[in-house]
Amino acid sequence: MEAEDGRGYNVPCPQCSEINWAISDEGRYYCMSCHTIIEKTREVEDSEVFVNLGKIQYISRGLRKKRKQEKGWEWYVCEGFQFILIKQAESLQALGVAPQIKDEIICTFWRRYLQKTNQAYVKRPVYRNTLNLRESDSSATELDSETDEFSDGITTDASDRLSVATEDIASGSESAVSIQSGSVDGVSHTKMSKNWKPWNYVKMSMPMTLAFCYLALLWLRASITLSDLLRFVFEKRIPYFNAHQYLPEEIKLYGQDVRIFRMQSFPVYNDILNKAYELGHYLDLPRFPEIIKNCYLHPNVLCMKYLMEANLPDELHHWTCQVAEKTGTDDLHLLTFDPACKKARHIRYDVQAVALIIVVLKLLFALDDNTEWQLSTFAERMNQRDKEKPIFEFQSWYQTVRSCYEKAQQALEEEYGRFTWKSDCLLYYSHTSKAVLQKRKQMSENLHRQFSKLAGAAPDTGKQGPSSFLFKWDEQNTDRICFHGHSLEAILQQGDKPATAINTHYWLNSLKKCKSRICQHSELYEQSNFPRSYHFIVSLFAFLLRVEHCVVHHEVCLIEETFFQEFQGKKNKQKQKPRKQN
C-alpha cells in the first residue's frame, strides 16, 4: 500500500534532522529517509473513522501477524546454548573425536545440568519464577500460570533441533518475549546473581560451553588437550566467536541476548580449566576414566609429543620419564579427575608435560647463560672429529628454533590483527538502534570493498587442515635441521651405565613455598629476573600452548618443589645437631 503524503508536518526528524515525512496505513508519521517512526498520528474526522473501520481492523490484524513472524520463536537462553553445544560437538567429531562425544557424553552432561539448575527434567521448572522477574512491555500480559512443564515440552528432531511446547500460550500474546531481549528469560538470566539458588555455583555462558567440551574430551581421554581446544577455537574450527550464526533463523537475538551470546575476547586457559572443574563438581559427576600409561594425556606421551614439537632429541624422553616418576606426576590417581575430591589440584596436562621438559633441560644444561654454551662448544668439537653420528649442539638448536619461532610469532600477531569480531548478521540491543546500525554496517562494507580494490586481492593460501603440531621439522626440501635423532654424548658422563649428566649445577626458581592466603606469585613473571636461555625456552613452550609465561613458569616451580623436596629434607637433617644424652 502506498503511504500518504505528510508534507504538512514541518518538524525535523530527531534521527536524521531531515523533513521528509509520510503517513503509514496506521496513521502514524514516519521519516522516509531513515524510517524512524514518531508518536504523532494523523488527525481524521469521525465520519472517516466509521467508513474505514473495517479496513483499519483488517490492516492491524495483518501487521500483528507480520510482527509475530519477525519476532520468531519464543525461546529460552538454555535452548540457544544447546544449539551451540550441538554444533561444537559436531565440530569435534569432524576433528576426529569419537562419535559418542555428542549423543552420549555432552548430551548426558547437559541433561544433568538442566536438572541441577531446575530448568528441565523436574516437576517445577525455574522458569515459572523467572518469568515474574522479567521486565515486560506495557502492552504485554502475563503468561498463564498453568503452562506445561519445560521438561515435558522438549523434543529433538532429526536435525537435533530443540523446541519447547507452547500450545498453552495464546497466539496473539506478545508477553513471552521482552522488549529488552529476544528470548523469554534473557533479562533475568543477565541479572541473576550467583548467590541466588539454583545458580549459586554455575551460570551458563559461552566460556562454559568450552568447559562442557573439555570435560567430554577428558572423559573420552581424547587426543586433544585444552591448549589444542583453544587453538581450534581461535582458528574458528569450533563455533565460539559469532556462534549465534549457527542458531536457526527463527531464534532472534537482540537486547540482552547479544551480551550473552556475543564474545569479544579470546578464551583464557586458566579460566576454562577452572570452569571445567567447577562444572564437574557442580554436576556431581563420577570419577573419570583413569589416565593410564598409553593414554594421550599421560605425561610420558605428552612429553614425547612436545619434544618433537620443540625439535629436541628423542633421548631426553628417558630423562623426562625419570623426573615424572620421582615427582609422582605419572601417578594415575593424581592424573585422574575425581569431581568428588574438591581439594584436588587442577591438572594442566599439557603445561605439566612442558614443565617436565624444562626441568630436564635445567638438569642437563643448567640454562644459566654459561654452562649450556660451554657444553655446546664441546659438542661442536666432537661433531668435527666424528661426523657419522650427530651430537646435539645447544647453540645450533637455539639458532634454528629461534628463527622459526620468531616467524611463527609474527604470523600469529598478524592473525590476531586480522581477526574479525563482527558477524555477518546484524545484532542490535534495541529496535530504535537497528536503523543506525544498518547504516553503519553498510558504510563499513562499502569502505572495506573500496580499500580492498585499492590494495589488491590478497593471495589465497588456503586454510590448512587441523594438526596437533605447529612446526614440522622432518619435512624435506627445507633448510631446517632436525635434532630428533641427535645424541647426548657431549653432556653425559662417559662409561657410566646409569647415565649421569656432566653438569652438577642447578638453580631453583623458588626456595620457599608461599603460605599467604592471597598469593599472586603464579601470575607474576619478570623476564629480567631469569637467564635469557631459560626465558627463551619458557617463551617457546608458552607460544606452543598459547598461554602466558607465568603459567609455564609456575608449573616448573611446582615440579621443582616436589623434585628437590627429598634432597632438601636430607640436607636439613644433616644440619640438625645431635641431642646430648644425660
UniProtKB/Swiss-Prot annotation:
Region annotated C-terminal cyclin fold, chain positions: 257-367
Keywords assigned by UniProt, alphabetized: DNA-binding, Metal-binding, Nucleus, Transcription, Transcription regulation, Zinc, Zinc-finger
Record bears the keyword Nucleus: yes
GO annotation terms (biological process): nucleolar large rRNA transcription by RNA polymerase I; RNA polymerase I preinitiation complex assembly
Keyword Transcription regulation in annotation: yes
Region described as B-reader: 40-69
TM regions (residue ranges): none
GO MF terms held by the record: RNA polymerase I core promoter sequence-specific DNA binding; zinc ion binding
Function of the molecule: Component of RNA polymerase I core factor complex that acts as a GTF2B/TFIIB-like factor and plays a key role in multiple steps during transcription initiation such as pre-initiation complex (PIC) assembly and postpolymerase recruitment events in polymerase I (Pol I) transcription. Binds rDNA promoters and plays a role in Pol I recruitment.
Protein name in UniProt: TATA box-binding protein-associated factor RNA polymerase I subunit B
Classification of source organism: Eukaryota, Metazoa, Chordata, Craniata, Vertebrata
